[in-house]
Amino acid sequence: MKFNEFLNHLSNYEPGKDIEVIAKEYGVKEVIKLASNENPFGTPPKAIECLRQNANKAHLYPDDSMIELKSTLAQKYKVQNENIIIGAGSDQVIEFAIHAKLNSKNAFLQAGVTFAMYEIYAKQCGAKCYKTQSITHDLNEFKKLYEAHKDEIKLIFLCLPNNPLGECLDASEVTKFIKGVDEDCLVVIDAAYNEFASFKDSKKHLEPCELIKEFDNVLYLGTFSKLYGLGGLRIGYGIANANIISAFYKLRAPFNVSNLALKAAVAAINDDEFAKKTLENNFSQMELYKEFAKKHNIKIIDSYTNFITYFFNEKNSTDLSEKLLKKGIIIRNLKSYGLNAIRITIGTSYENEKFFTEFDKILR
């Protein structure tokens, strides 16, 4: 059977390995997952209670207007409901953006190393990819590439902070760059980890209401999978000019997000204590990862996220990842990104200590 020719140029996305699979494969009783940047404290208590109260409604289709969650987000971000679209994870909104803007006759621009799904979704449409030589977000290089190919480039991805490296840009740098982009080119700001960046440094904070007020060609993406601990429910959102959102709705299937996910998301937003606990733990424990890296002469990039990336010269990331798996510790090997590096999610103090103990033995 023949398939779309664009599939010949695609590779499958490699997700983090599952706890149960590793336990069975390696015969370990305790498995610690520090691979997928999930919340180490699990699901917010208010969301858990909400799910309990609504579990008997799983047979019902959701309210397709999603009015409760939209109104909650609109109040949080000081925008209108018409500026918001809800997706089954923010990656579904990425897919909407790509299908709305890209085809085999145009192109997109991204950092040399960034979230893999941008390229996977875009190549499904046959779009050409322009990448910076720098693995991080070098806006001077972005500007040069855009100016050289602006007739082709119709979509730009800025992952802020960047996954899988963790670096971030000041908000003022971002807005200055966007001012040089034509209105017909959509700038997607993937802010999946921006709550972490904003907590660490207010200069990194991106305010969607200000962005869409100043620019008609900006899409701000948020998710409930990281800070809010709802990765398993698959729910995220996009905020943009009403005309952009209206176009995306033509690509959205009805009932694309479950009623339980919608209810839990509202509860999670209102669980301030859980969010505060998560952020404080993240950056206090991050310091221990920096100290460990310094002790072992491991190169890092200052991270504004809930993960840290370790770069190696002599050691091999695949070998290190395999040795950690044998100890029941799952991290993310970044070989598929062309890097001799591993990405580690910041866990609980117990999980992190277990990582330090076992990795210290491996590195000797």
Swiss-Prot record:
Pathway: Amino-acid biosynthesis; L-histidine biosynthesis; L-histidine from 5-phospho-alpha-D-ribose 1-diphosphate: step 7/9
Keywords: Amino-acid biosynthesis, Aminotransferase, Histidine biosynthesis, Pyridoxal phosphate, Transferase
GO MF entries: histidinol-phosphate transaminase activity; pyridoxal phosphate binding
EC assignment: 2.6.1.9
Pfam families linked: Aminotran_1_2
Modified residues (N6-(pyridoxal phosphate)lysine): K226
Catalytic activity: L-histidinol phosphate + 2-oxoglutarate = 3-(imidazol-4-yl)-2-oxopropyl phosphate + L-glutamate
Tree of life domain: Bacteria
An annotated GO BP: L-histidine biosynthetic process
Names of required cofactors: pyridoxal 5'-phosphate
Enzyme class: transferase
Subunit structure: Homodimer.
PANTHER family, per the entry: HISTIDINOL-PHOSPHATE AMINOTRANSFERASE (PTHR43643:SF3), HISTIDINOL-PHOSPHATE AMINOTRANSFERASE 2 (PTHR43643)
Similarity annotation: Belongs to the class-II pyridoxal-phosphate-dependent aminotransferase family. Histidinol-phosphate aminotransferase subfamily.
The protein, known as: Histidinol-phosphate aminotransferase
Organism: Campylobacter jejuni (strain RM1221)
Gene (name only): hisC
